């Protein structure tokens, strides 16, 4: 469905139309990291949370399996079902800015701004079926256009205000 301005729409689980990309993608893997903030520092606001991810350790396989289906007035028939699967690891590294809670007695080697980037890294293991088809599957590419990060966010943990939780989704955008 298209709305004014050309934005694409789809029906949500609740049955209402929403812009694409707003709700969770069908094929996704969630991730989260917990990062300790140094004593006396807080998350700088606004913050540009940045993530770099490596898709070079992912591979795609196409397999064929047999599936029995029921056909009206014919009974059961066995068909070849094509399966597209992505497997491997997604490594990522990211950073966000922190700043002193109190700037008094804080100094820096560059300019006067005492904010600094704090980094984190992790790996997500991937073993995910992307598609089933009765037709031959075309060639698919593993790249940043088809594997995207969505809903990337950072928040302080209520239980421990010196820890930040970074979370998001790796979405597999293959039609």
Curated annotation (Swiss-Prot):
Induction: Transcribed starting in early sporulation and into later stages; not expressed during vegetative growth. First gene in the orf1-orf2-cry2Aa (cryB1) operon. Residues 1-17 have a biased composition (Basic and acidic residues). Keywords: Plasmid. InterPro entries: CryBP1. Residues 1-21 are annotated as: Disordered. Encoded on an unnamed 225 kb plasmid. This is Uncharacterized 20 kDa protein in cryB1 5'region. It comes from Bacillus thuringiensis subsp. kurstaki. The lineage of its organism: Bacteria, Bacillati, Bacillota, Bacilli, Bacillales.
